Structure formats: C-alpha cells, structure tokens
Amino acid sequence: MLFRSHMSGSDAYVNVAGGIKVSEPALDLGIVMALVSSFKNRAIDEKTVIFGEVGLAGEVRAVSQAQQRVNEAVKLGFKTCILPGVCLKNIKKNDKIEIIGVNNVQEAIKLI
C-alpha cells in the first residue's frame, strides 16, 4: 500500500535553487521525498542525494545521465544516493557512496 496522507487539505510550495531546470523529470523523486519527510516529521540525511522520475502510479522511472549524476554527487560529498532501480545496471560501483535503487515511491519512503 502506498503512503497515504491527509495532505489534500494542505498547500505545498517548492523552492528550487537558481540554475536548476524545473522541467527536469529527475527532480520528481527528490521533491516527493522532501514532502513526505516534512509530513512525517523525519529528516532525510543531509548527505543523501535523491533523483528519479515519478509516474502517476508511483513507479520510479529511469532518468538520463544517471552515472554522471552519481559521479557529481560523490564530488559534492554525498554518501548515499537513492535512484531508480532500473538505473542500477548502468552504475559503476563506488566505495565512496552507497547506491540504493528503488522501483516505486513506496520503496523510497521506507528508507526514511
């Protein structure tokens, strides 16, 4: 069962840092996780990076340039990366960052 909340009566405002393309579908999962984190009052570790496109049924879809995104996360000092499970086959192992693949929003929510 997917995460269900009583957020329908709430407004959510998302502020995106300058220079980030808001049309980038890889932002979806990070935004969903930020909203769930706020609603559940549980912080996501500041050394965790999250990316992936989210479909209407809650599935987490692949995004382009997954390896480059992971490489950049390592350069920026992130220790954990949550990404689409289908991208795992194209990601090289790296001892500097833990890579966690998720196939749907429910799996991602269990991580916080």
Language model segments and positions:
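Peripheral, non-AAA+ core regions of ATP-driven protein-machinery
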Residues: 1-112
